[in-house]
């Protein structure tokens, strides 16, 4: 059994960073993804560098806050104030052909470059709100990832036993984006404990293992603070994730060999 437990949103707020690092030190998290567009991102990167057993990837952000690039250079990605568009508006622009691929590529490269400038080598990529799976974005992400030497891109294909509109949409997006990511390794299946709340005890972990292949469990642990409330709609659920991921019984259920890094 090989399961990867990844905590998203490192750097989104000081409280989120604290929760992720605690989930690593006391729990089953061995992988996290850094969002570089928040005010607390640089400090989060510095703290993560002090954890030698924590793999830090890039959490591409195209829907929150300000771009790393000069807003004037990525006009198709931002609103009149120079901020990223929300998910709904970005989706409309993407599927109406109003987002320039060159601007997408420039912003993604800028985010990876900024992470490296903070001492983080992000060889595993995923994204905020799974936007990297949207076909127009996936094509650009796949091309830039190859140029950057990325060794892992998250797929979000839910196991068939998980059903619902969100799971079906992510399964379809993963299928459509497969060609864009061809040749870049990734997980076979993905479960988000924040939204799906699978049973995570010995029996639940055994059920996940039965799906076979390399699976990824995504989570969003964190402590609630004002920066988080201002930046994201996912707030109180993060405390629940923190409790789940640091439960000693869960660590026992996983076993030391079950929780592996994504990037060899």
Regions found by a protein language model. Name each.
Residues 127-129:
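Active-site histidine-anchored catalytic micro-motif
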